[in-house]
Swiss-Prot record:
Signal peptide region: none
An example Gene Ontology biological process: translation
The family this protein is said to belong to: Belongs to the bacterial ribosomal protein bL35 family.
Taxonomy, superkingdom: Bacteria
A GO term from the CC aspect: cytosolic large ribosomal subunit
Listed InterPro entries: Ribosomal_bL35, Ribosomal_bL35-like, Ribosomal_bL35_CS, Ribosomal_bL35_sf
GO MF term (any one): structural constituent of ribosome
Keyword terms: Ribonucleoprotein, Ribosomal protein
Name assigned to this protein: Large ribosomal subunit protein bL35
Species this chain originates from: Caulobacter vibrioides (strain NA1000 / CB15N) (Caulobacter crescentus)
Length: 66
C-alpha cells in the first residue's frame, strides 16, 4: 500500500485540536463587511471548531493528521 498524500490546501487551512476536533477560519470575512454590526465581526474573528459533519470530510484530506 503506497503512502497517502495530504491535500496541500487542507493542511494550510485547518488545524487539529488536542482532542481531535478541527478548527478553521470563518468564511465571508474578506470584504463587504460594512453592513454587518461590530458584534458579528468580533465573534467571527479567529478560528472556530467545525461541525462534525464537515470535519469528517476534511479528515479524508488529512490522512495522517497535521
Amino acid at each position: 500500500m503506497p503512502k497517502l498524500k495530504t491535500k496541500s490546501g487542507a493542511k494550510k487551512r485547518f488545524k487539529l485540536t488536542a482532542t481531535g476536533k478541527l478548527k478553521a477560519g470563518v468564511a465571508g470575512k474578506r470584504h463587504r463587511l460594512i453592513g454587518h454590526n461590530g458584534k458579528y465581526i468580533r465573534q467571527n474573528r479567529g478560528t472556530k471548531v467545525m461541525s462534525e459533519a464537515d470535519a469528517k470530510i476534511i479528515r479524508t484530506y488529512l490522512p495522517y493528521g497535521l
